[in-house]
Amino acid sequence: MIVKEFRELRRDKRTLAMLIAMPLLLLVIFGYAANFEVKTVKAAVVGPQATAFAATLPSSFFNVTVIRPSDNQGDAVRMLQDRTVNVVIVTGRKPVLADVDGSNLFASQSIVSVLNKSGGKVSTQILFNPELKTSWVMVPAIIGLILTFIGTIVTSIGLVRERETGTLEQLAVMPIKPSTVILGKISPYFLVGSIDMIIITTLGRLLFDVPFNGNLFVFVLGAALFLFVVLGLGVFISTISQTTGQAIQTAFFFMLPQILLSGMIFPLDAMAAGVRWIGYLLPLTYFTMISQGVMLRGASLASLWLPFAVLTLMAIVVFSGATVRFRRDLAPGRRHHHGTAKPAASETAAAGPAAGAAGSEAGSLS
């Protein structure tokens, strides 16, 4: 029995690969990404003494990317809304004011800790999340996590079940483009995901008092684009999975990095550079930027152009890949359908002369 199970495991290469790859993946993630301490933050210094004050900041922690003596506090708030920097220090007043982006929870905690050691020379003001509530940061990210679950796991399982029941074979004989079939298949899941998004957003506001400071249209547009990406990913997973179990395994393998490396749990700024770049390849990373930006900071579409552009590119790539794979799945059934149709037509054509000959023979006998 033991030998038989080992043989079965050796034949199931996908499960074997998961057993080997998953521990390695978890080791890398928790070794290089499981870090809540942000060691460097982007800072801007504005106001009349901007240049002089910037020189006094500890360079090991503050990466001063902007020094503008002519800017004021209004400009500082706009820079934080655009997430150009994590903190803007406004000089020309006593004490000096530091506006901190509270939507970046762990970075803002580190900034406040460092500035509190200045001996009262700097007064801190936390914007967008004044009490540094974890729920305010997590709820916008959880919306994306739920959409990811629906798009990858639920969609892939639903489509694989159709293959197991033979429904896809019926689609193969229909004159429908693969892209049209995919759009028809993902439409119900798109609707379910949209309803869940509305429910979670509403409950987040009612239960946790999470603000919604931005434009609703920008938020809905970002959610729709992200949902399109993860639904395409779910279709792609279904095309490389033969059974429901394989679909669940593959979808979970795709979901785990998105949970841990998207910045939802561990801050991207605290990750090792190599692991951080993996995070930048994940769709949930960019939806989290959009949802937190719109809900907490009131960010505009113009300031969120990068995550929107990346999600658009991902949607094109993922949907194209899913269409190509889906076309390959339908191709054998369509070839079989055309192959059986041609002999039937030839038999009908052959039956015509035979029937005519039989009729003429009957006429001569009469």
Question: What is the predicted role of each segment?
Answer:
Residues 9, 152-174:
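Transmembrane helix boundary and interhelical loop/hinge segments in multi-pass membrane proteins
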Residues 1-137, 328-366:
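Extracytoplasmic/periplasmic domains immediately adjacent to an N-terminal transmembrane anchor
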Residues 74, 128-132, 211, 263-318, ...:
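Membrane-interfacial helix-loop-helix junctions in multi-pass membrane proteins
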Residues 25-40, 242-281, 285:
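Transmembrane helix segments
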Residues 157, 161, 174, 205-206, ...:
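Transmembrane helix-loop junction
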Residues 30-37, 156, 160-161, 204-212, ...:
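Short helix-capping/hinge motifs at transmembrane helix termini and TM-loop junctions
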Residues 138-156:
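Long, hydrophobic alpha-helical segments
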Residues 178, 182-252, 256, 301-308, ...:
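Alpha-helical transmembrane segments and their short interhelical loops
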